């Protein structure tokens, strides 16, 4: 896993949810950090903007923690390179 992607997503989540960065771990569920459904939509939009990717709604619904977000981002970046 790319540490730069991790750091960027960790910052996005911490800023969007107003939580301390050290609470945003790979396995911490966004809901456990206080995210409701609107927060999750805003997180996905912020991630899309930060990485210049598109996350379809059906995929966005599957992203519940940092690890899943990073996995999706890495896959999307790899696809753009092809």
Curated annotation (Swiss-Prot):
Under Gene3D superfamilies, the record lists: ACP-like
Q: Which SMART domains does this one have? A: PKS_PP
Q: Chief localization class? A: plastid
Q: Which pathway does the record list?
A: Lipid metabolism; fatty acid biosynthesis
GO molecular function, a single term = acyl carrier activity
Places the protein is found = Plastid, Chloroplast
Q: Which InterPro entries match?
A: ACP, ACP-like_sf, PKS_PP-bd, PP-bd_ACP, Ppantetheine_attach_site
Q: Where is the Carrier domain?
A: 3-77
Where O-(pantetheine 4'-phosphoryl)serine occurs, the residues are: 37
Q: Which domain of life is it from?
A: Eukaryota
Its keywords, alphabetically, are: Chloroplast, Fatty acid biosynthesis, Fatty acid metabolism, Lipid biosynthesis, Lipid metabolism, Phosphopantetheine, Phosphoprotein, Plastid
PROSITE patterns xrefs: CARRIER, PHOSPHOPANTETHEINE
- Reproduce the UniProt comment on modification after translation: 4'-phosphopantetheine is transferred from CoA to a specific serine of apo-ACP by AcpS. This modification is essential for activity because fatty acids are bound in thioester linkage to the sulfhydryl of the prosthetic group.
Quote the cellular component terms of the Gene Ontology held in the record. chloroplast; cytosol; membrane
Q: Which GO terms describe its biological process?
A: lipid A biosynthetic process
Function, in words = Carrier of the growing fatty acid chain in fatty acid biosynthesis.
Record family assignment:
Belongs to the acyl carrier protein (ACP) family.
**Entry's HAMAP family?**
Acyl_carrier
What name is this protein filed under?
Acyl carrier protein
- Organism the protein comes from: Gracilaria tenuistipitata var. liui (Red alga)
Taxonomy of origin reads: Eukaryota, Rhodophyta, Florideophyceae, Rhodymeniophycidae, Gracilariales
Its encoding gene is what? Answer: acpP
């Amino acid at each position: 896993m790319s540490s730069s992607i991790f750091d960027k997503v960790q910052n996005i989540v911490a800023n969007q949810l107003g939580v301390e960065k050290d609470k945003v771990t790979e396995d911490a569920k966004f809901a456990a950090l206080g995210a409701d459904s609107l927060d999750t939509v805003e997180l996905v939009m912020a991630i899309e903007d930060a990485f210049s990717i598109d996350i379809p709604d059906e995929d966005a619904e599957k992203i519940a923690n940092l690890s899943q977000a990073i996995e999706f981002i890495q896959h999307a970046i790899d696809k753009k390179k092809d």
